[in-house]
Structures are given as structure tokens and as C-alpha cells.
Amino acid sequence: MYVLRTHLCTQLGEGNIGEEVILCGWCNTYRDHGGVIFIDLRDKSGIIQLVSDPDDSPKAHENARVVRDEFVLIAKGKVRARGTGLENPKLATGKIEVILEELIIENRSLTPPITIGDESVGEDLRLKYRFLDLRNPKAYDTFRLRSKAAIAARNSLDGMGFLEVETPILTKATPEGARDYLVPSRVHPGEFFALPQSPQLFKQLLMISGFDRYFQIAKCFRDEDLRADRQPEFTQIDVEMSFCDQEDVMGVAEKLLGDIFSACGHTIPEHFPHLTYDRAMEEYGSDKPDLRFEMPLVEVIDLFGDSNNEIFAKIAQDSKKNRFKALKVKGGDLFFTRKTLGVLEEFVKKFGAAGLAYIQVKEEGLKGPLVKFMSERSLSLLLERLNPEVGDIIFFGAGEKKSVWDYMGRLRLEVAKQMGLIDPNQLCFLWVVNFPMFEKDEGKVKALHHPFTMPKNLDCEDVEEISSIAYDVVLNGVELGGGSIRIHQEAIQKRVFDLLGIAPEEAQEKFDFLLEALKFGAPPHGGFAIGFDRLIMLLTQSPSIRDVIAFPKTQKATCPLTSAPSPVSSEQLKELHIRIKEKTQTH
């Protein structure tokens, strides 16, 4: 038998009945039915049933008897239809089988510690044996789609005149780079490279170089606490262009995403709706709202100025600092019980709420703990503003605006999930625009996006009122990516550094190459980056970003497969001029 397959398993169908074929793969399952042996052969495409009958080929049957799970097999045989009533509708090849004429055991396997495709196996064990976990055809389908998406991205950007350029992986640490991964330099003792959190500065330098349109599918690194959609090393589609405005950049992003989704079997709108940052926060409590369902937050702070509750009345006195949000849930009073309302209250308490007030709309009128704290006039205005119907429930959140936005936005999502209001197959894109340039965190001014974003009203006295030409693209409540128009004038860049508390000496030390480049005729430019792993996670409806990365890290930033990170030898440390400080004993 030639060691050369003629088909992949799922390339065979009823049209191949009677043909001789050679297949290669792994034994997925093995069954001995009193002499006749059935082997489910698995390759990257899927599974097909092999049948070994001693009357057809004694030698093949002799080999088949010793086959066990995950043995590597090369099988030659003839395709035939399965018997009436023996078809398997769960398999793409469920109407046919292959009668073995020859069988080669190319390699044996130990008993696998995990069952291929068994999703009940713990993730740590699956990642430790990731090379086995990836044998699942479902995993192969994920990475085939990932490959299609990457090819589509390259073709799309190439078609729009973008040039693919690779930027350095070993680069310079920056002031905001507390989450940088550092690489010690052997030839420069005591000095370190940083792995890039993004190619931001290099792609700006390429615009100053006159490259006009750049892209790369870039590896990026960030040493941060992990969540379901975060990894310490990740991939992004990175794009930058010159002589453009915000609409130009967004148009390129929409065309790129349209081409990627088309290659993956989806049709999406040519253009996405826009939502300002302020409106997103006020109406949805999030700068990445999920708009697959209605249910906006409504401001009602003006209805509590005359409340007989001192706390509510005090909150209502400062409408700049505070918010009082109402969330009308259609049919919510019929859906939620006293017990489940208690669960929702505990849910919002985890995110800073003191409790969860509500009003139930019943046939006999309004009921609930909040009714007694509102005047007749305020209740009348509330009904006019929200227009609730019998069977609805209205939830309320009050307090400092950022806190209220956060927990009421989370409540909105949680209610929608519990009530089954979200269509998992719907793709809802939008742009969030007009972001603030800065935010204050414990009194310190920070850039909301990054310090290279072009501000709009830099002379505003209140830094929190300064806005930026920045934009995020959101899909189904997930930030898919974002970008901005960049600062291309040295004076503006220095002013932004100053507002961020970066002293001129520090700015010169850390960003001298950028500030120098801005003196030599930098063009107006802007760009964006799309989180590629996150994009594939959404396209495949995977619960975790780890499912779409071949060899991911755990939520503790470790690799169970390779046991990384790991200690290194004292000789290596010595060469790098590093000494590990011994842990001090505490008693």
C-alpha cells in the first residue's frame, strides 16, 4: 500500500460508493462486535467508520484487533453504503463506511489522559495536553476560520493600498508601561528592552517616513491580570494612514471588517451606527454597549429633588456629580420573583450598589419600596417619561455617576441574559465616538486611550472636559478595537505630556525619538487596531479567548504544557547581570 492518502475523511460521500480509497488519521474509537471490528477514523476534517471483517481481509483484521484510541493508522479499503437503519445522522459521513482491505499501524499511543472533544474535561488538564486537545476537529475548524480571516484581512488591506511592515518586538519601556514585559540586555548590563503593548509609536514613525498606509498582523504583550477575553500575548490587526480624518479611518475599518466577515460566511452592514461616549454611558452604562436588545437607562434625578428620603434628595442636589437611573424591564414583574430580585440585588452590590430599589407596575397601581419616597407629582412624571405597562418592573440606581453607570449597565446585561433577550446569532456593530481625552484616577490625570491621541479642546480649564478624536468599534457589547487621529505637532504633544504630569526631562528621555521626528514635517495621520483573537472568539461564539489561540496561557499567566514561566540557571542569570533576591522569612 502506498503511504499516500487519496481523500480526507469527510471528502467521502455516497458519490464515492464502490471506490477504493486510502485514508490516514487517528483511531477515535474502537469497537469489537464479536469478530467484526469497527474503528472510527479521525483526521482534521472529521470522522469516518472503518469496518474490518476477518472474511474480507484476515491480515487487516489481525492488525485491527490491536488498535486502540489515538493509534496512528493508514487504511486502504472500499467505500460502501451503511445498512438500512445503521446510518449515523450525527456524522457528515454517516451514510457510508469503508471496508478494510489493508491497515497499517503507523504509530501507537499511550492511553490518552483526556478524551478528544470531551468538553467536560477541566481546562488546566486540556491545556497541559493541548497537543491532544487540538486533535478535536472542532478546534481545527476554529483555526481554519482564523486562517481565513487573516488572509482576508491581508487581501482587503492590500487592495486598499496598505503596505505590510513589521515593527520591532524588542523596544523601549515607556512611562505608562507598568505592564510591560521586560527583557534584560546581556550586552548592556542593567538595561532592559520592553516587549511592545502595541506598535503605536513605530507606526506613527512610518507615517512620518512617508509610507502613507501601513498595516501588520502584530504580536503584542501586556503583563496584566487576565480575564476571559485577555491574554498576556495577543494578536491585533494594526493599521495606520496619513492625510485622513476620522471618517476616512472608520471607512477603512468598516471595509476591512466587511471583507473578513464575508470570508467567514457572514454579511454585515456596509456602515455602522455612531453613538457618542456620553450617550453610551448615560443610556447603557457602558462605553461598549450591547445593542442587540432595547432597554436604555433613563435619567430621573430631577424627580427626586422633593423626595422625603434624605439620601435620595441629597443625591438629586448635584446632577453634575451624581446620577439617578431608571431601567424599565418589559414583563419583568411577571418574570422575577422575590427570590430572584434578591439575587439581582446581591449582583449589583458586588459592583458598588448599596441596594436595588424597584417599582412594580401592577393592575392595582405602583408597588415597591421606592413608591413611598416619591411625591404624587414625581410618580406621575415617572409614568409619563417611562410609559410602563402592567407587568413591567422599573429598577433604580442612585449615587456617584461612574458607579451608577457601571452597576446599572451590568444590571441591564444581566437582566437581558436571564430573560433570554439576546440573540446569540445577531451581529450588532457600532462606533462609540467623542471620548474624553483624560480621566482622573485617585486624583492623577491619565489618558483615557493613550497620550498620542489628538485632543479637540486642549485649552479647556477642566481636563476632564477635554475631548479627543478617538473611536472604538463595538460588536455585541465587546470592544473589538479602536483608534484615533494622532497628534502630529510637537507643541501639542508636549502640552499633553505636561497635562499628564510627565516632566519635560522624562518626556525627552522616554519619547525623544518621537518628539524629534515630529520636528521634521509629520503629516496628519490616524489609525486603529482590531483585536484579532477577540474577533475570532466572537466569530466562533467561543466562551474564552483561550479557545482561539493555539497554545494560550491560563488566567494565572502560565503555560501548563511547557511549564512556563520557569526558573533559569544561575549561569544564565550571571550572563544577564541579574541576581534573584531571596525571599525574606516572616514569622
UniProtKB/Swiss-Prot annotation:
Family, as annotated: Belongs to the class-II aminoacyl-tRNA synthetase family. Type 1 subfamily.
Site, Important for tRNA non-discrimination: residue positions: H33, G85
Physiological role: Aspartyl-tRNA synthetase with relaxed tRNA specificity since it is able to aspartylate not only its cognate tRNA(Asp) but also tRNA(Asn). Reaction proceeds in two steps: L-aspartate is first activated by ATP to form Asp-AMP and then transferred to the acceptor end of tRNA(Asp/Asn).
Localization terms from the record: Cytoplasm
UniProt keyword list: Aminoacyl-tRNA synthetase, ATP-binding, Cytoplasm, Ligase, Nucleotide-binding, Protein biosynthesis
Domain of life according to the entry: Bacteria
A GO MF term: ATP binding
Matching Pfam families: GAD, tRNA-synt_2, tRNA_anti-codon
HAMAP family listed in its UniProt record: Asp_tRNA_synth_type1
SUPFAM superfamilies per UniProt: Class II aaRS and biotin synthetases, GAD domain-like, Nucleic acid-binding proteins
Residues annotated for L-aspartate binding in this entry: E176, R222, H449, R486
PANTHER family tied to this protein: ASPARTATE--TRNA LIGASE, MITOCHONDRIAL, ASPARTYL/LYSYL-TRNA SYNTHETASE
Record lineage: Bacteria, Pseudomonadati, Campylobacterota, Epsilonproteobacteria, Campylobacterales
Protein name from the UniProt record: Aspartate--tRNA(Asp/Asn) ligase
Coiled-coil regions listed in the entry: none
Chain segments carrying region Aspartate: 200-203
GO cellular component: cytoplasm
List of residues binding ATP: R222, D223, E224, Q231, E479, G531, F532, D533, R534
Assembly and interaction partners: Homodimer.
Main location group: cytoplasm
Gene Ontology BP, a term: aspartyl-tRNA aminoacylation
Name of encoding gene: aspS
